[in-house]
């Protein structure tokens, strides 16, 4: 039986069957359509980027952020976006996981020549995820990590003096988030979670260039490009609530491959009525650390106070409404400062992080099986 020709160029042998479209394409055509689709997501409407922006790529060393760093570097040169790109990594303090994945980030930094900033939970909060799990257990530890990580990214971006954070959230991730918000009845977040770009007047802009990129295609891109990335799942994630949505989504995808994009489009169609929007809490600044919050005390400060007090997960909610200074002897989060002004006129940023030299450990790679 003769080999199947590429459905796009009709000359080379097809090596990839795209999960999203079912097209059978050759390797070079796959690279072209994948990169073009990401570019189209970036420039659609008013566009994600503005020329001259300083953009931090949230880099974990995993497949999504590794491919994102590679593709953005390529597209920035090909289409002359005029961006200053940086790598921003958060060290949650998970032994045997994050310490190894950061070595992959360092290799990516050396390969692409991008400045790298690493900010740790230990440095910022005085706690590592290993210590947090020791105290609260594995059942709800992702709540802590999600809250702490989001604030750490904003603080790292402020230290770099960047205008914009991009993350490797892919179509599967976004569809899972839509399902989670439906299952939790969180209507307010449904439309927001599907947006390519989110920003309020008090927050650093965040974007998801891989909004329509399927996870399987990201893996195939990394494989055929021979990109090095860290493949191990977080050791604390098997008990995460997101896992249930992921299993359900994979079952749907097996029956209907378009289910992922269909769910995203469903989330996009949710629009809150004005009466509901008016009833939502306005954003303010945390009285303790100065970070953005819908309460007098931000979630990170509330969770940290609970940890410092030795509270169990069930008792941590009691600290949410606290407005007083932290109890004596408790560690607190440093005051949050933006280095780029909110009105578009940048203040003088700190000196960007110096390139990281040397890779101390062997970097793991993954093969598609």
Curated annotation (Swiss-Prot):
GO biological-process terms attached to the record: protein urmylation; tRNA thio-modification; tRNA wobble position uridine thiolation; tRNA wobble uridine modification
Alphabetized UniProt keyword annotations: Cytoplasm, RNA-binding, Transferase, tRNA processing, tRNA-binding
Pfam families membership: ATP_bind_3 (PF01171), zn-ribbon_14 (PF16503)
First-tier enzyme category under EC: transferase
SUPFAM superfamilies: Adenine nucleotide alpha hydrolases-like (SSF52402)
Protein EC: 2.7.7.-
Pathway: tRNA modification; 5-methoxycarbonylmethyl-2-thiouridine-tRNA biosynthesis
Major localization class: cytoplasm
Compartments it resides in: Cytoplasm
GO CC annotation terms, alphabetical: cytosol; cytosolic tRNA wobble base thiouridylase complex; peroxisome
Cited InterPro entries: CTU1-like_ATP-bd (IPR056369), CTU1_C (IPR032442), Ncs6/Tuc1/Ctu1 (IPR000541), Rossmann-like_a/b/a_fold (IPR014729), TilS/TtcA_N (IPR011063), tRNA_thiolation_TtcA_Ctu1 (IPR035107)
HAMAP family, per the entry: CTU1
Entry's family note: Belongs to the TtcA family. CTU1/NCS6/ATPBD3 subfamily.
Role of this protein: Plays a central role in 2-thiolation of mcm(5)S(2)U at tRNA wobble positions of tRNA(Lys), tRNA(Glu) and tRNA(Gln). Directly binds tRNAs and probably acts by catalyzing adenylation of tRNAs, an intermediate required for 2-thiolation. It is unclear whether it acts as a sulfurtransferase that transfers sulfur from thiocarboxylated URM1 onto the uridine of tRNAs at wobble position. Prior mcm(5) tRNA modification by the elongator complex is required for 2-thiolation. May also be involved in protein urmylation.
Stored PANTHER family: ATPASES OF THE PP SUPERFAMILY-RELATED (PTHR11807), CYTOPLASMIC TRNA 2-THIOLATION PROTEIN 1 (PTHR11807:SF12)
Protein name, UniProt field: Cytoplasmic tRNA 2-thiolation protein 1
Source organism of this protein record: Cryptococcus neoformans var. neoformans serotype D (strain JEC21 / ATCC MYA-565) (Filobasidiella neoformans)
Gene: NCS6
């Amino acid at each position: 039986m003769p080999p199947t020709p590429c459905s796009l160029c009709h000359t080379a042998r097809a090596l990839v069957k795209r999960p999203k479209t079912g097209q059978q394409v050759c390797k070079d055509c796959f690279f072209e359509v994948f990169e073009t689709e990401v570019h189209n997501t970036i420039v659609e409407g008013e566009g994600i980027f503005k020329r001259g922006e300083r953009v931090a790529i949230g880099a974990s060393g995993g497949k999504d952020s590794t491919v994102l760093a590679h593709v953005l570097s390529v597209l920035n040169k090909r289409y002359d976006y005029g961006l200053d790109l940086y790598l921003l990594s958060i060290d949650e303090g998970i032994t045997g996981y994050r310490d190894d994945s950061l070595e992959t980030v360092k290799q990516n930094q050396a390969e692409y020549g991008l400045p790298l900033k690493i900010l740790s939970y230990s440095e910022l909060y005085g706690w590592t995820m290993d210590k947090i799990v020791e105290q609260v257990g594995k059942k709800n530890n992702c709540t802590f990590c999600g809250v702490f990580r989001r604030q750490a990214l904003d603080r790292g971006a402020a230290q770099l003096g960047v205008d914009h954070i991009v993350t490797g959230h892919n179509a599967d991730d976004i569809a899972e988030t839509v399902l989670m918000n439906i299952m939790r009845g969180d209507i307010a977040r449904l439309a927001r979670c599907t947006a390519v770009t989110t920003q309020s007047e008090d927050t650093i802009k965040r974007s998801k260039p891989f909004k329509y990129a399927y996870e399987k295609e990201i893996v195939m891109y990394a494989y055929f490009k021979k990109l090095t990335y860290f493949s191990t799942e977080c050791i604390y994630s098997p008990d995460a609530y997101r896992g249930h949505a992921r299993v359900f989504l994979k079952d749907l995808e097996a029956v209907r491959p378009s289910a992922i994009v269909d769910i995203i489009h469903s989330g996009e169609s949710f629009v809150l009525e004005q009466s509901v929007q008016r009833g939502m809490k306005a954003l303010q600044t945390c009285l303790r650390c100065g970070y953005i919050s819908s309460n007098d005390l931000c979630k990170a400060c509330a969770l940290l106070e609970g940890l410092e007090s030795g509270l169990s997960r069930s008792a941590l909610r009691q600290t949410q409404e606290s407005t007083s200074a932290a109890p004596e002897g408790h560690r607190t989060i440093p005051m949050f400062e933006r280095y780029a002004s909110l009105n578009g006129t940048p203040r003088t940023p700190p000196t960007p992080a110096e390139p990281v030299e040397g890779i101390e450990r062997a970097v793991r790679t993954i093969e598609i099986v």
